[in-house]
């Protein structure tokens, strides 16, 4: 089997199960364009002289997957870069049993899954991978602004008009009193007329019988 194909198959298996020997962090990270990213890979059981390689995969694992060897740290040579890697954007340095990968001025094209790897004899050991997403605008967690619900206008009945003047009770009482007075006056007039007629009749009778 060709070494390139062997590395491809081994890395695909690493994407599925990873390794507890190499502890990689963070699991995923999202940054804005031109931002900076720091990843770490710690070898738990390997000696401090073990080389830790950094690989990148730009898309989800598939039969046509292409993995790039980015860089590794050599105690004598220092940072050893892979092909087509921009040294000004990528730095690797050791920290005891860890390897630190520092990416600067990242672009959306740098998005992908980053793996750390150690080479044994003959096995390859991989970290679980760090998924990097580079976006132009970071998503916000703020909730969308809700338009206030317009309040319904309540139709109020017109206020009763207060009429100034005497109350109904007083008005009715006044009418009754006026009616009684009219009746009394009418009765007095009728009695007076009756008396006048009676007197006139008596006078006529007296004149007739003389």
Curated annotation (Swiss-Prot):
Cytoplasmic-side segments: 192-210
Residues exposed to the Extracellular side: 22-170
Keyword hit for Cell membrane: yes
Entry keywords, A to Z: Adaptive immunity, Cell membrane, Disulfide bond, Glycoprotein, Immunity, Immunoglobulin domain, Lipoprotein, Membrane, Palmitate, Signal, Transmembrane, Transmembrane helix
Record Gene3D superfamilies: Immunoglobulins (2.60.40.10)
BP term (GO), one: adaptive immune response
Span list, region Disordered: 139-161
Main location: membrane
Bilayer topology annotation: Single-pass type I membrane protein
Domain Ig-like V-type: 22-132
MF-aspect GO terms: coreceptor activity; MHC class I protein binding
PROSITE patterns xrefs: IG_LIKE
Transmembrane segments: 171-191
Signal peptide feature range: 1-21
PANTHER family: T-CELL SURFACE GLYCOPROTEIN CD8 BETA CHAIN (PTHR11292), T-CELL SURFACE GLYCOPROTEIN CD8 BETA CHAIN-RELATED (PTHR11292:SF7)
Quaternary assembly: Forms disulfide-linked heterodimers with CD8A at the cell surface. Interacts with CD3D; this interaction couples TCR-CD3 with CD8. Interacts with LCK.
This protein's name: T-cell surface glycoprotein CD8 beta chain
Naturally occurring in which organism (per UniProt): Felis catus (Cat)
Gene that specifies this protein: CD8B
């Amino acid at each position: 089997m060709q070494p390139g194909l062997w590395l491809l198959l081994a890395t695909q298996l690493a994407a599925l199960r990873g390794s507890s020997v190499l502890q990689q962090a963070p699991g995923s990270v999202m940054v804005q364009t031109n931002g900076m990213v720091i990843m770490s890979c710690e070898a738990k059981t390997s000696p401090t002289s073990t080389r830790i390689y950094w690989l990148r995969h730009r898309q989800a694992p598939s039969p046509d997957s292409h993995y790039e060897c980015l860089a590794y740290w050599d105690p004598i040579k220092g940072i050893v870069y892979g092909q087509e890697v921009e040294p000004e954007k990528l730095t690797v340095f050791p920290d005891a049993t860890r390897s630190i990968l520092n990416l600067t001025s990242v672009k959306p094209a740098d998005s992908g899954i980053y793996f750390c790897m150690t080479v044994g004899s003959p096995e390859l050991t991989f970290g679980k991978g760090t998924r990097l997403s580079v976006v132009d605008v970071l998503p916000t967690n703020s909730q969308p602004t809700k338009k206030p619900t317009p309040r319904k206008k309540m139709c109020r009945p017109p206020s009763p008009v207060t009429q100034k003047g005497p109350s109904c009770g007083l008005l009715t009482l006044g009418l009754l009193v006026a009616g009684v007075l009219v009746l009394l006056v009418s009765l007095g007039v009728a009695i007076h007329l009756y008396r006048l007629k009676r007197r006139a009749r008596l006078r006529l009778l007296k004149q007739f019988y003389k």
